[in-house]
Amino acid sequence: MKQKWKQKLPGILLGLVFLVGLGIFAYPTVADQWNKYHQSRAIASYEETVADMDEVDYQKLWEMAEEYNSQIGNNTFDGDAFSQEEQNMRGSKYWSVLNPGDNGIMGYISIPKIEQRLPIYHGTSEAVLQIGAGHMFGTSLPVGGEGKHSVLAAHRGLPSAKLFTDIDQLVEGDKFYVHVLNKVLAYEVDQILPMVEKDDTDTLTEAMKNVEGEDYVTLFTCTPYGVNSHRLLVRGHSVPYNGEDDEKAIANESMLQTVKDYYMLYAILAVAAAILITVLIKIIRDRKASRGSKEGGK
């Protein structure tokens, strides 16, 4: 018996090493696909909630958001979304604005260039930044308007989700879209600050300030990839939403992402199935060989 185990041990260890290696290799992809599934479900739930509303509801929530923006005036914040403390926002005025599902989702952002769609949550707590984009408290709510500047933050380089990992691929002229209630707001990238020290509050504050007559949205994340000692800011200014042309870009992005997600999922399942089948065949063969040796010894 001991001799048989000694013979099998190298194969077992090799199999375990292979499985561990496969797990490490597949984890980022599997985790990202899992997060994208939940992000898609969150966006779908938001769209269903919005679809059940009528024009009066839209108008009421939109006016509340514009009133909130008027009351806060110029952006007020500590300069870094990732240093904001997590607060219990439920019951606050901020939480009640642009929150049709009472789940903290105020809309979602679509970035066709990098094939990314993320729900936008109230605030930038760590819990929020792990699963989507967060609206930076103290900046304008993302409903547009002259003299408004909304800041949306998300992590970059998480092993479990891509989020804003690829926004360094954006260049001036690229567009992104903010979906809020029954409206789609289009923004064109016009400024990129690729490397700002996280403690350089003067530069960060200047980059995210309100500018009279302008309607801005800034995408805020950490950099360099995996180091996170600096901040990357991608700013876009409001441009007309071209309806059919822009919808085509959004639809193509969504369809392409769905196809990629399914192919990746099927590939992972196929590899897992192949490993399982191989292991089962090995077990069956070993049992047959063991039975044969026992019968031969009788």
Segments from the language model and where they lie:
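Extended boundary segments
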Residues: 93-141
